[in-house]
Regions:
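A polyampholytic, Gly/Pro-enriched intrinsically disordered region
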Residues: 1-10, 84-93, 170
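Conserved N-terminal subdomain of the carbohydrate kinase-like
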Residues: 1-37
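Conserved post-catalytic alpha-helical subdomain immediately downstream of the catalytic base
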Residues: 117, 144-174
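Short, charged, surface-exposed secondary-structure boundary motifs
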Residues: 13, 92-95, 148-152
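Conserved phosphate/ATP/ADP-binding segment of small-molecule kinases
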Residues: 44-138
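Fold-independent oxyanion-binding glycine-rich loops
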Residues: 4-7, 39-41, 69-70, 87, ...
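Glycine/charged-rich beta-loop-alpha catalytic/anionic-binding loops adjacent to active sites
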Residues: 135-147
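Conserved structural-core and active-site-/substrate-pathway-adjacent residues in large, well-folded domains
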Residues: 36-41, 86, 128, 156
Length: 174
């Protein structure tokens, strides 16, 4: 199999960003969701203006925001209910290799700095780490090693699953 992607990643202009924000505002007003997932692929849709507007609308409407970030906007999601980077993304943000001995503290510092209630770090075959309630509780979630042909979409699956769990008012650690 072979895959080749050719694409341009550029920020939405202010007119398109404003139109997107209007659509999101309309959906919130009419559908009254209790959760929003922001899946940021670093393709230019999630501009500072869009991110700030979505977070503000969510806050005003008591909506939990779940974020799967990418590198460019990593520090723009202040106040998110759950922040789910992968190991490489968090390591790149910190500018160092992740160390199991300091990981809990690194995650907690990030949560405090950006007002992130829950931090879920995916680590591939090492499983996941969940830091809840602004770093008060810390859990290592082991993975079950399996033969996997392709990990494409694994992060999307994780954020979607955790969002459904929270929307159903199930405790995250369970």
């Amino acid at each position: 199999l072979f895959r080749a992607d050719y694409e341009d990643a550029f920020d939405l202009d202010s007119r398109d960003a404003s139109r997107l924000i209007d659509v999101i505002e309309n959906v919130i007003a009419n559908r009254k969701p209790n959760v929003i997932i922001i899946q940021d692929y670093d393709k230019g849709v999630m501009t500072n203006e869009v991110i700030a507007s979505v977070l503000n609308l969510a806050d005003k409407n008591n909506i939990k925001v779940f974020v799967d970030p990418k590198k460019r906007n990593f520090d723009k999601y202040q106040g998110a209910f759950l922040f789910k980077p992968n190991e490489k993304e968090f390591s790149d943000y910190l500018g160092k290799k992740l160390d199991d001995d300091t990981l809990e503290e690194d995650m907690k510092k990030f949560q405090e700095k950006f007002n992130i209630r829950n931090f879920l770090l995916t680590r591939g075959e090492k499983g996941m780490v969940l830091s809840e309630n602004f770093g008060e509780e810390y859990y290592v979630i082991p993975s079950e090693v399996r033969s996997i042909a392709d990990v494409t979409g694994a992060g999307d699956t994780v954020i979607s699953t955790f969002t459904v769990i929270c929307a159903a008012d199930v405790d995250l650690k369970n």
